[in-house]
From Swiss-Prot:
Forms part of the ribosomal stalk which helps the ribosome interact with GTP-bound translation factors. SMART domains: RL11. This is Large ribosomal subunit protein uL11. The gene is rplK. One of its GO terms (biological process) is translation. The keyword Glycoprotein does not apply. One or more lysine residues are methylated. The keyword Cell cycle does not apply.
Length: 141
């Protein structure tokens, strides 16, 4: 029989850099999970992606054990890297802060494909382009 789920915790943690300090410690500590065990497992699983912030979904069971699933980095972070900017525009409709090409958008779609809710590559590209527009990043040919 399957274990009974106690809680599901969603966090965004830099790959390979989980430690018991906030936000990881308090989020897991309140559910009675062994925080150091999670940090060691997460860091070992995400060493190859160092430098990226990864969303992680942690499933905590009644017996205080856990499993976790890492997702692809958020589209906004990938777009900021592609456009070489520190942050998005405060007024995206008026002020453009950077540019990305369609080819860069296509690369981001390849990275994010498993986490996107799109049936075609074109639809996924439109989703990423929409995120770029909302950040004040111009999409050029």
């Amino acid at each position: 029989m399957a274990k009974e789920v106690s809680a599901i915790v969603r966090l965004q943690i830099p790959a390979g850099q989980a430690n018991p300090a906030p936000p990881v410690g308090p989020a897991l500590g309140q559910h009675g999970v062994n925080i150091m065990a999670f940090c060691k497992e997460f860091n070992a699983a995400t060493q190859k992606e160092a430098g990226n912030i990864l969303p992680v979904v942690i499933t905590i069971y009644k017996d205080k054990t856990f499993t976790f699933v890492t997702k692809s980095p958020p589209a906004s972070i990938l777009l900021k890297k592609a456009a070489n900017i520190a942050s998005g525009s405060k007024e995206p409709n008026r002020t453009k802060v950077g540019k990305v090409t369609k080819a860069q958008v296509k690369e981001i779609v390849k990275i994010k494909w498993k986490d996107l809710n799109a049936s075609t590559e074109e639809a996924a590209m439109r989703m990423i382009e929409g995120t770029a527009r909302n950040m004040g990043i111009e999409v050029v040919e």
